[in-house]
């Protein structure tokens, strides 16, 4: 059985060698960003997000912390912080999973099958249950405003100002969710 440090290195190296765009924070394998594309055949298709991942020292026995940096409208994701509902992560997490599973299975399934009974975003949950067409329209609006390729590229590459990640926040008056690392 390998140590947690070795497992972290192995899983992050697999992710770095995959097709995902990964950026380590200060060359630290326990904190990084991944560019994530919304799964096809879902309302999130075409969306591009920057996902912040932090691996605890107890990884893989303890689940990673996952958060969307640019905004997403989803019942199980906090709209302002971008945090993914811990219950959702912890209920499905197993030490047998690796970081590739997070981006190829876990996050696509979360977006494909939102759980309105365990919401972090009450508005999204209520709309999904009561007015699904309005919910899907709002998801598409958020993708157009916060998760298109141009904005994701700016978000992924902007290192000039800690307080802004893209020009969209100053144009719309909305804040983009999550902290921005100045080295990113």
UniProtKB/Swiss-Prot annotation:
<comment type="pathway">
    <text>Protein modification; protein ubiquitination.</text>
</comment>
<protein>
    <recommendedName>
        <fullName>Ubiquitin-conjugating enzyme E2 8</fullName>
        <ecNumber>2.3.2.23</ecNumber>
    </recommendedName>
</protein>
<dbReference type="GO" id="GO:0005634">
    <property type="term" value="C:nucleus"/>
</dbReference>
<dbReference type="GO" id="GO:0010637">
    <property type="term" value="P:negative regulation of mitochondrial fusion"/>
</dbReference>
<feature type="region of interest" description="Disordered">
    <location>
        <begin position="154"/>
        <end position="184"/>
    </location>
</feature>
<keyword id="KW-0067">ATP-binding</keyword>
<dbReference type="GO" id="GO:0061631">
    <property type="term" value="F:ubiquitin conjugating enzyme activity"/>
</dbReference>
<comment type="similarity">
    <text>Belongs to the ubiquitin-conjugating enzyme family.</text>
</comment>
<dbReference type="GO" id="GO:0043161">
    <property type="term" value="P:proteasome-mediated ubiquitin-dependent protein catabolic process"/>
</dbReference>
<dbReference type="GO" id="GO:0006511">
    <property type="term" value="P:ubiquitin-dependent protein catabolic process"/>
</dbReference>
<dbReference type="GO" id="GO:0000209">
    <property type="term" value="P:protein polyubiquitination"/>
</dbReference>
<dbReference type="Pfam" id="PF00179">
    <property type="entry name" value="UQ_con"/>
</dbReference>
<feature type="domain" description="UBC core">
    <location>
        <begin position="3"/>
        <end position="148"/>
    </location>
</feature>
<keyword id="KW-0547">Nucleotide-binding</keyword>
<dbReference type="GO" id="GO:0045721">
    <property type="term" value="P:negative regulation of gluconeogenesis"/>
</dbReference>
<keyword id="KW-0808">Transferase</keyword>
<dbReference type="InterPro" id="IPR016135">
    <property type="entry name" value="UBQ-conjugating_enzyme/RWD"/>
</dbReference>
<dbReference type="InterPro" id="IPR023313">
    <property type="entry name" value="UBQ-conjugating_AS"/>
</dbReference>
<keyword id="KW-0963">Cytoplasm</keyword>
<dbReference type="GO" id="GO:0005524">
    <property type="term" value="F:ATP binding"/>
</dbReference>
<keyword id="KW-0833">Ubl conjugation pathway</keyword>
<comment type="function">
    <text>Catalyzes the covalent attachment of ubiquitin to other proteins.</text>
</comment>
<dbReference type="InterPro" id="IPR000608">
    <property type="entry name" value="UBQ-conjugat_E2_core"/>
</dbReference>
<feature type="active site" description="Glycyl thioester intermediate">
    <location>
        <position position="85"/>
    </location>
</feature>
<dbReference type="GO" id="GO:0005737">
    <property type="term" value="C:cytoplasm"/>
</dbReference>
């Amino acid at each position: 059985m390998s140590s947690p440090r070795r497992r972290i290195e192995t899983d992050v190296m697999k992710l770095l060698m995959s097709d995902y765009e990964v950026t380590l924070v200060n060359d630290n394998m326990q904190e990084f960003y991944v560019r994530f594309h919304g799964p096809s055949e879902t309302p999130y298709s075409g969306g591009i997000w920057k996902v912040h991942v932090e691996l605890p020292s107890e990884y893989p026995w303890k689940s990673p912390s996952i958060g969307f940096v640019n905004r997403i409208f989803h019942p199980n994701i906090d709209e302002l912080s971008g945090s993914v509902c811990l219950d959702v992560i912890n209920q499905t997490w197993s030490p047998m999973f690796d970081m590739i599973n997070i981006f190829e299975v876990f996050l696509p399934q979360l977006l494909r099958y939102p759980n309105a009974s365990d919401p972090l975003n009450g508005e999204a949950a209520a709309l999904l249950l009561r007015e699904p067409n309005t919910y899907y329209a709002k998801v598409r609006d958020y993708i157009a405003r916060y998760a298109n390729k141009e904005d994701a590229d700016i978000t992924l590459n902007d290192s000039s100002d800690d307080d802004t990640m893209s020009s969209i926040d100053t144009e719309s008056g909305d804040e983009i969710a999550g902290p921005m690392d100045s080295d990113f």
